[in-house]
Amino acid sequence: MKTLKGYAYDARTVEALQAVNEPGVYQFFGMRGIGKRIAAEIVAEKMLGSRLSANPDYLMISPKEKNKVIGIDDIEDLFVFTGQMAANASYKVCVIDDADLLTESAQNALLKLLEEQAGQVVIILVAHRHLIDTVESRAKLIPFYSLQREEMKEVIDDLDPLVAELSGGRIGFYKSMVASNGYVQTVKNALKFIENGNKADLFDCLHVIREKDKASFYETYDLPLIRAFVSFLRQVFYKILLGASGIEFGFTPGIDVSKASEHYSILSIQAAVSVLSNAERMISDGRFNKNDWFDMLRFIAE
């Protein structure tokens, strides 16, 4: 692990970031919450030699809140920006955050700009998922890696092993989980329910199962946090399945998996793994809604 202006990153990522020193297209690629946007701003500031605030040579493009996409209008703004001479630096720098939310037409327009402006501008694409091949082929890929738990301990005091596991080694995601009202306790209570085979625990911690409160949990926690919760539950049930089958497995923070395996049949565990895996796919495809969330919880609680 190394730090970049006080932020912790995998050593391989820091080495690649320090090598960004000339115009071109760079794609910062990795899971959400791993620090890509912050790294992009650090690199942009280094290349411009001055602060980004009110800097005429810097442009940040991100999804419009209403549509949650980056459209062709945004790329037209980028054409205007790159078509003007740099005011204070040798070149201009643009960061496109959530670049994987560029529409196909916007990506094609971006491709045209990359062909015309090669060597004259720095464009950093911050992406959690892949872009179209023709755009990616023109970018220098800089992968971002998650940190090991021991590395996280170096930068987070009193590291919670359960949250570290949930976050997948992403410092930013870890902090989001801790800051989200009641999220960590919700997960811990759910694990307690699974360990004891007691429905009441889950119903108490997820009171939204009651019809009158049906929207609360889903509106309180954004989709990445819910996906992490679902993914972790799938891993827990998979380890319960291994234990019930007599196969040894590693330690899982927050739950005694051996104890939990006493409360479930192998068929019910297999069904839970299947339901949770399907929920993960639906979240990835953008098809997961509140009804799916509650149907999933009811299935696991039965």
Annotate each predicted stretch with a short phrase.
Residues 102, 111-114, 220, 224:
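Short, surface-exposed loop and linker segments with low hydrophobicity and enrichment for Pro/Ser/Thr
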